[in-house]
Regions:
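N-terminal "arm"/small-domain region of PLP-dependent enzymes with the aminotransferase-like
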Residues: 1-46
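PLP-dependent aminotransferase class I/II
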Residues: 29-32, 51, 186-264, 268-271
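Conserved beta-loop-alpha segment that forms the PLP phosphate-binding cup at the N-terminus of a helix
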Residues: 52-53, 67-90
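PLP-dependent aminotransferase-like
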Residues: 85-139
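Active-site pre-lysine segment of PLP-dependent enzymes
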Residues: 119-121, 126, 139-161, 165-199
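PLP-dependent enzyme catalytic core of the Aspartate aminotransferase-like
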Residues: 147, 296-297, 310-349
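Conserved PLP-binding catalytic core of the aspartate aminotransferase-like
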Residues: 252, 265-298
């Protein structure tokens, strides 16, 4: 449900200089993709392939799986709702803080929901049927290596582990679990084209799982759920040759630099992240007030993360931009913190 999400910039353009709230990556190749889609507009005159066969074949080649392991969805969020629907009224454990749609989807389909901060906690709580994690996680960038997740799969053969890898391409030295779904029947991996190519408006994602799970999900999937241009976009992206990741590497280095510099600010906590985004916490002020002041005084937008389950009023998320903007943001952030922290506070828990 959209209320669980972050910023809506439609009414803020007149104030906005730079958006540090969004954790998509402005890939240099996105312009070429948009040019290509301009040449494919006639595709909307026909119904799209309801089975997404060409895109599934390309994904199967990429991950060395058969197409029967793949379901293409209208963005990764649709995959969450399909899973919750197919396994309705079961018990789901969600590692927090987490993307709100895991909980929203499970609530909609009457799951009993457990919240844990670490997978190890599951040994001490009522057994769950499904376990949901972001890897890397949103909003804090936590990342678990495949070896850790494989160990969990082997120790919990009756639990279905749902791994959301929407941000895996924006995580330093990360390894996907996608190719392992052929070895573990209790593994579901959800992926997206959105974050690396900055195309959230196209709505194209996919899910990888054992064919028995895929068939269960297909029974809940409405016909023509993925539109023709979204399919064209996915096919185009998968046909791109491997490109040097210089721009992304620079962005990740900038994220590290920002984290290190902001960690030195008094009354301010930075949660280390290997991604282009990271979580912060103000000790004596609210993220809502900081967001207001940053936008009003400097035109910078951050993500108030206080509505993530388990987080506090001082939590907010930052996504690194280019070096010039990042330097301006750091200066602005320090100025705003100095202005608001002496007079604002909230109770500790």
């Amino acid at each position: 449900m959209i209320n669980g999400h972050g910023n809506n910039i439609q009414g803020l353009q007149h104030l906005l200089k730079a958006d540090f709230s969004t954790n998509v990556f402005d890939n240099p190749q996105t312009g070429d993709l948009l040019d290509y889609l301009q040449t494919q507009l006639r595709a909307i005159r026909n119904y799209p392939d309801s089975e997404c066969r060409l895109l599934r074949e390309k994904l199967a080649d990429k991950f060395n799986l058969s197409p029967g392991y793949i379901l293409v969805t209208s963005g990764s969020t649709e995959a969450f709702y399909l899973l919750a629907h197919a396994f309705q009224k079961q018990c789901s454990a969600i590692r927090t803080p987490a993307f709100a749609e895991y909980e929203d989807a499970c609530t909609l389909y009457n799951h009993q929901i457990l919240f844990v901060e670490d997978l190890n906690e599951l040994n001490n709580v009522k057994p769950s049927d499904l376990v949901w994690i972001g890897n890397p996680n949103n909003p804090d960038g936590r990342y678990l290596r495949p070896q850790q997740l494989v160990a969990f799969l082997e120790q919990n053969p009756k639990r279905l582990l749902v791994v959301d890898e929407a941000y895996i391409d924006l995580c330093e030295a990360a390894e996907s679990m996608a190719s392992l779904v052929g070895q573990h029947q209790n593994l579901v991996v959800i992926k997206s084209f959105t974050k690396l190519f900055a195309i959230p408006g196209i709505r194209i994602g996919y899910l990888l799982a054992h064919p028995q799970i895929i068939k269960k999900l297909q029974a809940c999937h409405m016909p023509w759920a993925v539109n023709a241009l979204a399919l064209k976009a996915g096919e185009y992206i998968l046909d791109l040759p491997e490109q040097p990741t210089v721009a992304l590497d620079h962005r990740l280095q900038e994220s590290k630099r920002m984290q290190a510099e902001l960690a030195q600010v008094a009354g301010f906590r930075v949660f280390p992240s290997p991604t282009n985004y990271f979580l912060c916490e103000l000790e004596q002020a609210t993220a809502a007030e900081l967001k207001k002041q940053l936008l009003k005084r400097h035109g910078f937008l951050i993500r108030d993360a206080s509505n993530f389950r388990g987080l506090r009023p001082g939590h907010f998320r930052v996504a690194a931009q280019n070096k010039t903007l990042n330097n301006e943001f750091i200066h602005a952030l320090k100025a705003c913190i100095n202005a608001i922290q002496p007079c604002l506070s909230y109770p500790s828990h």
